[in-house]
From Swiss-Prot:
Any one Pfam family match given in the protein's UniProt record, by short name: Ribosomal_S8
Function: One of the primary rRNA binding proteins, it binds directly to 16S rRNA central domain where it helps coordinate assembly of the platform of the 30S subunit.
GO biological process, one term: translation
Protein name as annotated: Small ribosomal subunit protein uS8
Keywords: Ribonucleoprotein, Ribosomal protein, RNA-binding, rRNA-binding
SUPFAM superfamilies on file: Ribosomal protein S8
InterPro entries in the cross-refs: Ribosomal_uS8 (IPR000630), Ribosomal_uS8_CS (IPR047863), Ribosomal_uS8_sf (IPR035987)
């Protein structure tokens, strides 16, 4: 697999489209950090790291509105890819839907949202947009 982050986002999108409650994805440190950010920002209900085998898996519980059965995540968009990396400085930090969504940035201080990176005045690689 050439792009594990794109695979992770696609698995989440497919599970949302099929109205699954839980999706299980192969684990990596970067995926764990992205999942933690999605949980902290309220886009997913819960997550659990399961160590089964050399790599392990992440079980992600998706968050749905109780009335309309609409998912909290409207769109997951991969920005930087292995073939075409996209970097940004803190002054040019992307605003996703005028601040309603988040951009997940991989920086020298770890993986964080665009707002956190701008506050710390550090740039990095734009991994994806979530809204």
């Amino acid at each position: 697999m050439t792009d594990p982050i794109a695979d992770y986002l696609t698995r989440l999108r497919n599970a949302i489209g099929a109205k699954h409650r839980v999706v299980e994805v192969p684990a990596s440190n970067l995926k764990k950090e992205i999942t933690k950010i999605l949980f902290e920002k309220g886009y997913i209900l819960n997550y659990k790291f399961v160590e089964d085998g050399p790599q392990g898996t992440i079980k992600v519980a998706l968050k749905y509105d109780s009335v309309n059965k609409v998912n909290a995540i409207k769109k997951l968009e991969r920005v930087s890819s292995p073939g075409m990396r996209k970097y940004t400085g803190y002054k040019d930090m992307p605003r996703v839907i005028n601040g309603l969504g988040i951009a997940i940035i991989s920086t020298s201080k770890g993986v964080m949202t665009n707002k956190e990176a701008a506050e710390l005045k550090i740039g990095g690689e734009v991994l994806c947009y979530v809204y």
